[in-house]
Amino acid sequence: MKVLWAALVVTLLAGCWADVQPEPELERELEPKVQQELEPEAGWQTGQPWEAALARFWDYLRWVQTLSDQVQEGVLNTQVTQELTALMDETMKEVKAYKAELDEQLGPMTSETQARVAKELQAAQARLRSDMEDVRNRLTQYRGELQAMLGQSSEELRARFASHMRKLRKRVLRDAEDLQRRLAVYKAGVREGAERSVSSIRERLWPLLEQARERNAKVGALATQPLLERADALGQQLRGQLEEMSSRARGHLEEMREQIQEVRVKMEEQADQIRQKAEAFQARLKSWFEPLLEDMQRQWDGLVEKVQAAVATIPTSKPVEEP
């Protein structure tokens, strides 16, 4: 923007020093009409950021159109196209941000309605962007034609360009108003869905609130009773709980006593079984080794008898006398 204003000032100063001739009568007659065509629509509202961005887009274009031929020749370059593209992108960005803000603040609608409205909004955004691109392309075309007619009369070209701009402006305003209406419908539908959700939540929470109110009423009634009565009721409740715990403890002790008795009986039975098995095993061992011992005793006795008999049969030798 600073570059454009600098070019405007330099061109105006150059025109003053060159003693430029006054504009033709036809151009002076067309200028009020062009100014009237470029005035904003009375019914157009700029309450939302995207609407303000669209207004800035048209303000910039109106400023370009109100310049003289010499100034337009100096400023209608690629930078103007870039500025218009930036303003167009800003408008589309603000539209998306506004829709996202509605979704975040008011909550989603039903899936079917949300899909249908989202599709309609996308189509309206696409039409508005297409119209703004047509404006930018028409401005680029006008710049080329203006450069081609350098040094010639451009009243007819300016009149034709103003007519095209008027038609394009009507298209842009029509599609912008359509987008406004659809966003308003979307906002109303989202609010209605949020109200239905709140009503559903209220219906679900109402019984819980009634129960809480009843409990609070009971607690309040208890709080109004005398302290002695409440203490007596609490003592009876504690006494009942202690008696219940005592009976449970006695029951557990009886069960433990019975279990210990059963264990003692089982241990005595197992000890008797072990004793009987030991006696049986001892008897079996005795039955195994007694015949063997008796046989060994007989063999030993026989061996002793044989040794004694052999010793008895050996003759005793006489002692040898010395000469």
From Swiss-Prot:
This protein's record includes keyword Nucleus: no
Residues the entry annotates as binding heparin: L168, R169, K170, R171, G235, Q236, Q237, L238, R239, G240, Q241, L242
InterPro entries listed in its UniProt record: ApoA_E, Apolipoprotein_A1/A4/E
Modification Phosphoserine occurs at: S153
Region ranges (LDL and other lipoprotein receptors binding): 164-174
Residues covered by region (Specificity for association with VLDL): 284-296
Database matches in Pfam families: Apolipoprotein (PF01442)
Signal peptide: 1-18
Region (Lipid-binding and lipoprotein association), start-end ranges: 216-296
Predominant location: secreted
Modified residues annotated as Methionine sulfoxide in this record: M149
CC per GO annotation: chylomicron remnant; endoplasmic reticulum; extracellular exosome; extracellular matrix; extracellular space; glutamatergic synapse; Golgi apparatus; high-density lipoprotein particle
GO function term, MF aspect, one: phospholipid binding
Post-translational modification: APOE exists as multiple glycosylated and sialylated glycoforms within cells and in plasma. The extent of glycosylation and sialylation are tissue and context specific. Glycated in plasma VLDL.
GO biological process: AMPA glutamate receptor clustering; amyloid precursor protein metabolic process; artery morphogenesis; cellular response to lipoprotein particle stimulus; cholesterol catabolic process; cholesterol efflux; cholesterol homeostasis; chylomicron remnant clearance
Key words, A-Z: Chylomicron, Endosome, Extracellular matrix, Glycoprotein, HDL, Heparin-binding, Lipid transport, Lipid-binding, Oxidation, Phosphoprotein, Repeat, Secreted, Signal, Transport, VLDL
Region (Homooligomerization), start-end ranges: 272-323
Subcellular location: Secreted; Secreted, Extracellular space; Secreted, Extracellular space, Extracellular matrix; Extracellular vesicle
Region (8 X 22 AA approximate tandem repeats): 86-261
Biological role stated in the UniProt entry: APOE is an apolipoprotein, a protein associating with lipid particles, that mainly functions in lipoprotein-mediated lipid transport between organs via the plasma and interstitial fluids. APOE is a core component of plasma lipoproteins and is involved in their production, conversion and clearance. Apolipoproteins are amphipathic molecules that interact both with lipids of the lipoprotein particle core and the aqueous environment of the plasma.
Family recorded in the similarity comment: Belongs to the apolipoprotein A1/A4/E family.
Quaternary state and interactors: Homotetramer. May interact with ABCA1; functionally associated with ABCA1 in the biogenesis of HDLs. May interact with APP/A4 amyloid-beta peptide; the interaction is extremely stable in vitro but its physiological significance is unclear. May interact with MAPT. May interact with MAP2. In the cerebrospinal fluid, interacts with secreted SORL1. Interacts with PMEL; this allows the loading of PMEL luminal fragment on ILVs to induce fibril nucleation.
Protein name: Apolipoprotein E
Organism field: Canis lupus familiaris
Lineage, top ranks: Eukaryota, Metazoa, Chordata, Craniata, Vertebrata
